[in-house]
Design a protein with these regions (language model features):
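N-terminal, leucine/charged-rich tether regions that mediate assembly and partner docking
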Residues: 1-122
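Intrinsic-disorder/low-complexity, polar/charged segments
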Residues: 42, 169-173, 194, 224
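Extended assembly-interface/linker segments at domain junctions
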Residues: 93-190
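Short, hydrophobic/aromatic alpha-helical segments in well-folded domains
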Residues: 95, 215-218, 234
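Short, charge/polar-rich alpha-helical segments
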Residues: 188-203
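Non-transmembrane amphipathic alpha-helical segments
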Residues: 201, 205-222
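Short, charged, amphipathic alpha-helical segments
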Residues: 225-235
Length: 235
């Protein structure tokens, strides 16, 4: 078999994806101009491509024929796209949003960087690391009521050492696979059941934690009993 296209040290095979889904190295590299050369693109988006992205590559194409899963009208195929970003850079959310908006099927983004802060295994606090790192990201539709304007959102997982980063083909249909890949990215869980409800619950919890932290800080800054009581009421 031809050498598989890679992003840093990661390719379809090291990620654990089917060999048949791997894109050959000769066909993997994608020029940035491919994504910003058509239609109206803001100067800010062009700048993001220039500064936030070092290279783009197609790592794998997941289809019924390459996964053994049943077809799905919504997801005839799912692309696995590698984005190499500068050392220490964040997941390029704006670039991901722009690329994913150009097609209807799902895309899993494999973001790779050569070093940056990683959470300490014991304390969870960020510590500097020069190891190659990976973070997965997806752009997913947010459930809305019928007739309402569609909403999408980019979700990214945490940075982790690239060695050992895996994506698992799971489910019986391509749509179930997409839900599973989203769950693997967002919840670090292979089971994509009720993933939208789980995303909503997680975001609600994050919001409440943020509001509690703000109220706690306001309570600490309060100089009068009235101010402290007002802040306490929000906690």
């Amino acid at each position: 078999m031809a050498i598989a296209a890679s992003c840093g040290s990661l390719n379809a095979l090291t990620l654990g994806l089917p060999t048949r889904a791997a894109v050959p190295d000769a066909k993997g590299a994608l020029p940035k101009q491919m994504f910003i050369g058509r239609g109206a693109v803001s100067a800010k988006t062009k700048q993001r491509f220039a500064t936030d992205i070092e290279s783009i590559g197609m790592l794998a194409i997941l289809r019924p024929a390459t996964t053994g899963l049943a077809e799905s009208r919504r997801f005839p195929e799912i692309l696995v796209l590698g984005l190499h970003v500068p050392s220490g850079a964040a997941v390029p959310v704006e670039v991901i949003d722009h690329i994913a908006a150009q097609r209807q099927g799902g895309i899993v983004f494999v973001c790779v960087r050569d070093g940056g802060p990683l959470p300490d295994a014991e304390t969870g606090e960020p510590i500097a690391s020069d190891a190659e790192q990976c973070a997965f990201a997806v752009r997913r539709n947010v459930p809305v009521k019928p007739g309402h304007t569609p909403i999408t959102k980019v979700h990214a997982g945490a940075w982790r050492p690239a060695a050992g980063s895996r994506l698992t083909v799971y489910g019986t249909t391509m749509e179930e696979l997409w839900d599973s890949l989203c769950a693997q990215t967002i919840a670090d869980d292979i089971d994509g059941t009720d993933i939208d409800a789980r995303i909503a619950a997680r975001e609600r919890a994050t919001f409440l934690e943020s509001e509690y932290a703000k109220a706690k800080a306001a309570h600490a800054r309060a100089r009068t009993t009235e101010q402290r009581n007002a802040a306490y009421g929000k906690m």
